[in-house]
């Protein structure tokens, strides 16, 4: 099976698998990350086939929706790609991308690096910030039943991986614990450039949020 057909089959698989997913981690999120990754990849020396597969499968079984289990996603991707007779070397690379792409707290050190992961990670982080990022953040907060904001609960700026995974803090805290940190964690020049506008939009949003929260007119 040629690469184009594998991508086509992967799109079908992801759409079916995530048909009932939470709105911030559904097919439309995957689609945006896929497109962003392809755009960023134009300016990087990468294997585009690996980039596309990694982008499409990066949230195939997100640990947040599987009791914190980080092994289900890579395993599910391997089973699917093996069924399409994809080379094992590529499958292993995609597995490592899935295992290492997610932000897991400001104190967590990533264990694997590759140019392809850099591209996909930037794409995923871009979709976590800006207008879309704000919408996704509040959607997930509502899904988890979290408060919008509580001035008495301060953000934890140095969370460990386990603290991050277990956190049920108000949604506004997530801006400080993750979203506002991402601009400086972009891997590629293109990712950093694209992150600038989205980062500024979040800062403007927060400024307006606090004015309205305080009852200002």
Regions found by a protein language model. Name each.
Residues 48-65, 73, 94-104:
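His-Asp-centered metal-binding catalytic motifs of divalent-metal-dependent phosphohydrolases/nucleases
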Residues 27-34, 52, 91-102, 203:
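Short, well-structured alpha-helical segments
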Residues 2-6, 25, 48-49, 69, ...:
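A generic short alpha-helical patch detector that favors 3-5-residue windows
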């Amino acid at each position: 099976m040629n690469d184009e057909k594998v991508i086509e089959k992967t799109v079908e698989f992801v759409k079916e698998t995530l048909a009932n997913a939470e709105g911030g981690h559904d097919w439309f999120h995957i689609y945006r990350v896929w497109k962003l990754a392809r755009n960023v990849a134009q300016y990087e020396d990468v294997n585009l086939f690996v980039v596309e597969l990694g982008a499409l499968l990066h949230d195939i079984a997100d640990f947040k929706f599987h009791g914190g289990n980080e092994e289900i996603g890579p395993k599910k991707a391997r089973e699917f790609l093996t069924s399409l007779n994809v080379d094992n070397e590529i499958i292993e690379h995609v597995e490592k991308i899935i295992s290492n792409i997610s932000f897991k707290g400001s104190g967590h050190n990533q264990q694997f690096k590759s140019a392809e992961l850099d591209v996909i990670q930037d794409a995923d982080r871009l979709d976590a910030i800006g207008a879309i990022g704000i919408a996704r953040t509040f959607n997930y907060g509502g899904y988890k039943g979290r408060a919008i904001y509580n001035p008495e609960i301060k953000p934890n700026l140095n969370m460990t991986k386990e603290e991050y995974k277990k956190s049920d803090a108000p949604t506004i805290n997530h801006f400080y614990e993750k979203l506002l940190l991402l601009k400086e964690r972009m891997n590629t020049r293109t990712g950093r450039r694209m992150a600038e506008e989205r980062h500024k939009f979040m800062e403007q949003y927060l400024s307006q949020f606090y004015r309205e929260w305080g009852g200002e007119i």
